């Protein structure tokens, strides 16, 4: 039944995307919330602080994994480098214009196999906030499914953003923002993840470079699928798009690549759908 639900949901999301330019992911938040029970975080010890609408995680050492599940309305904050947040059937939403998940230090988001996870950010803010946001580097991995909706500005935002693993990600920003906004974007070798970039000004927008060595990318209804700054924006930095492997499928994008022309090196064939 879980696999059937995944297929049906993905089918209707993609049909909606292909049928009308600018159509958003149609998620019935109310019915989805009801599918998720009480919020649970493991371990729940003195490294976890719970206040009204905020859960702060601050392990004393690096490389600690916290498994989270259930429903939470507010913000989850990580303060320690290399902390892993393992999503195991979780629905996190923030309706105050803030990130639903925020990292002060390098953070990894990992989805558990066979799980469906929702990270939603709504409301208004003068800041260009994302549903998942990290002040430092951010890694997205695992083998489950995540629906990330950033209705404030961006879907995902970090310094250097790396995708890995075999999971499926549906990420949506806004008509002014990006599905992924970062300094540099990296996709590791020999990974099979699927990244659906939906209904935003940009799919992946990097200040410097986009380097992709594997993965499956789907860009639907974005202004530009892959975009970096140029020498005109910042002459002191290297800018370019380098895609050596993986797959790229696009539908209703105004432009696929936007970077320094001599530094746009793409090996896989771009498939128009």
Give the role of each language-model region.
Residues 21-273:
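A composition-driven surface/loop motif
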Residues 11-19:
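Hydrophobic h-region of N-terminal signal peptides that target proteins for export
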Residues 2-10:
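Sec-dependent signal peptide recognition
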């Amino acid at each position: 039944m879980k696999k059937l639900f995944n297929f049906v949901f993905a089918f209707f999301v993609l049909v909606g995307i292909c049928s009308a330019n600018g159509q958003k992911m149609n998620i019935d938040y109310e019915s989805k919330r009801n599918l998720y029970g009480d919020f649970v975080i493991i371990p729940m010890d003195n490294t976890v602080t719970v206040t009204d609408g905020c859960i702060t995680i601050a392990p004393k050492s690096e490389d600690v994994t916290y498994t989270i599940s259930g429903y939470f309305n507010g913000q989850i904050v990580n303060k320690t480098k290399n902390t892993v947040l393992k999503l195991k059937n979780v629905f996190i939403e923030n309706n105050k214009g803030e990130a639903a998940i925020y990292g002060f230090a390098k953070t990894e988001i990992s989805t558990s196999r066979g799980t469906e996870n929702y990270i939603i950010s709504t409301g208004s803010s003068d800041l260009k906030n994302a549903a998942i946001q990290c002040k430092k580097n951010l890694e997205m991995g695992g083998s489950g499914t995540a629906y990330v909706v950033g209705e404030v500005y961006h879907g995902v935002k970090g310094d250097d953003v790396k995708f890995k693993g075999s999971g499926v990600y549906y990420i949506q920003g806004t008509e002014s923002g990006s599905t992924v906004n970062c300094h540099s974007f990296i996709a590791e070798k020999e990974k099979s993840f699927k990244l659906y970039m939906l209904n935003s000004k940009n799919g992946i927008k990097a200040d410097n470079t986009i380097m992709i060595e594997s993965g499956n990318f789907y860009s639907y209804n974005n202004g530009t699928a892959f975009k970096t700054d140029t020498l005109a924006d910042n002459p002191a930095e290297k800018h370019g798009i380098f895609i050596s492997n993986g797959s790229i499928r696009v539908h209703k994008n105004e432009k696929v690549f936007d970077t320094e022309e001599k530094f746009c090196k793409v090996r896989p064939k771009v498939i128009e759908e």
